[in-house]
Amino acid sequence: MDRKILMLVALVAAASATAQETYENARIATEDLNGTARYVGMGGALDALGADLSTIGTNPAGIGLFRHSQAKISFGFVSQQDARDFDNANKTNMSFDQVGFVYSMRNGRKSFVNFAFNYHKSTNFNQILSAANVLSGASQNKLSYLKGAGGLFSVGPNDKGDLVGDNNMFNSVDYLYYNAFLTTHDEDGVPSYGYNDATAYAFNRASSGYIGEYDFNISGNIDDRLYLGLTVGIHDVNYNGYSEYSENLVSSEGTPVGSVAIGDERIISGTGFNIKFGMIFRPIENSPFRIGISASTPTWYDLSTRSHTVLANNTDLGEYDSGTSDEAYDFKLYTPWKFGLSLGTTFGNYLAVGASYDYANYGKLDTRINDGGGYDWYY
C-alpha cells in the first residue's frame, strides 16, 4: 500500500460545538474553591456571614459588613504527587490565589458605604489526568464511522481530493480518521469504509493556565440590618492543554492489528464578564443570625482557540501512516444564571457557623461558534 503523510490546515472553523471539548467547556464554566484563607477554611460558606473579601464574587453584600478598610493577599500550592509523569508537567505548582482591598466610609451612625476590588484565581488549570481501561465493541474510529453511516454527515472528495463532510458535524478528528484510517480505495478509485473495534485505551492529559477574575464592588448597609451589594466581574482566560489518546485495535475476527493514537494540543484564551447582586439581612435586631440571597448573571465569554492534532496509524490498515490537523476559530461561551441562599451566625467571638447553597443549571451552558467562514483543506 502507498503510505503517505496527511496534513490538514483549518484556518477558520465554522464547526459545531463538538469541536470544543465538553471537558474544557465545563472547566471554564465552573470555579474552584479559592480565595482568602478564611474563605477556603470555611468551605466558602461565608455568603451570609460576610466581612471577607472573597464574598465579593459570591454574595456582593458581604463586603457591606466591613467597618474598616483593609487589604489582603493569599498564596497556595497545587500538588499531585500521585500523578504519572506526562509531558514534563510539574506535579507541584505555586498559586497566586487572591489580592484585594476594601475602602470603608461611614455614612451615618450605623450605616457604611464600601468600595472594594479583588483579584482571585477562580480556576486553576494546572492538572495531570490519566485513565486506562478495557473496551468492548467500541472505538474512537468507530464513532467517526457511525456518525457518517448514521447520516450526521455525508463524506465526499473536495477539489483537493481529500474526504470532507458536508456539514458542521464533521470535525477535524473525523477528517483524520476518514482520510488516514477508515477509507480504502479499489483499483478503480472507488472508496469503501470500515472500522475496527478496540480492546483497550489509554488517555493522558496535562494542562496549565488559569482563569483570573477581577471584581469591582460597591456595597453598604442600612441601620446595620440590611446589607446590599453589586459586583462587576471581568474574567481573563488562559488555558493550554496537551492530551494523548491511544487504542489497541482488533480485526472483526478479534485478531490484534495494531494501535492508533491521537495527540491534541489546544490553547484557549479570551475574556468574559458578569454582574452579581447580593443581599444580607438580620431578621432579629439583637441577633447575629443572618440570611443571604445572591444572584449572578451568566458569564459572557468571548474566546479564541487554536489546536494542533496528530494521528499516528500504527497498523497496516487505511491509507496513511499519520495525519495532522491545525485549526483556529473564535467562539462564545455563556454560563447559566447562578442563584445562592445562605445562612450564618456567630457565637460570641469564638465560633462562626455558615451554610450556603448555590444553584446553576449547567444544562443551559451555551456555546456558539463565530461563523466567519469555512474550512480550508490542504495536503
What residues fall within each predicted segment?
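Bacterial Sec-dependent N-terminal signal peptides
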Residues: M1-Y23
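Active-site-proximal flexible loops/turns
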Residues: V9, F66, N240
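A broadly conserved detector of short glycine/acidic/proline-rich loop/turn motifs that flank catalytic sites
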Residues: L11, L46, F77, M105, ...
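Single-residue recognition of alpha-helix boundary sites
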Residues: A14-A15, Q70, H235, A360
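Outer-membrane beta-barrel porins/channels
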Residues: Q20-L33, S104-Y379
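N-terminal targeting signals for Sec/Tat export/insertion, comprising classic cleavable signal peptides
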Residues: T30-A48
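Outer-membrane beta-barrel translocator/receptor signature
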Residues: A37, L49-T58, I63-S136, G209-G212
